[in-house]
């Protein structure tokens, strides 16, 4: 019975570690993925660099 508890605990720790490491990886790499240029056809930037709609 003790061996079953140990293996269950090990499985829980492994799953928790994988989830935490996946979350940390997503947070660290997200800032490098989301750089989108701010100049589609209907948008212009003002002097401060803020996107403005032009109709």
Curated annotation (Swiss-Prot):
It is found in: Secreted. Keywords: Disulfide bond, Pyrrolidone carboxylic acid, Secreted, Signal. It comes from the Eukaryota. Expressed by the venom gland. The modification Pyrrolidone carboxylic acid is found at residue 32. One of its GO terms (cellular component) is extracellular region. Residues 1-31 form the signal peptide. Contains 1 disulfide bond. This is U17-myrmicitoxin-Mri1b.
């Amino acid at each position: 019975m003790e061996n079953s508890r140990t293996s269950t605990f090990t499985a829980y720790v492994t799953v928790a570690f994988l989830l935490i490491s996946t979350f940390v990886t997503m947070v660290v790499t997200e800032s490098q993925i989301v750089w989108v240029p701010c100049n589609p056809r209907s948008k212009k930037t003002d002097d401060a660099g803020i996107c403005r709609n032009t109709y």
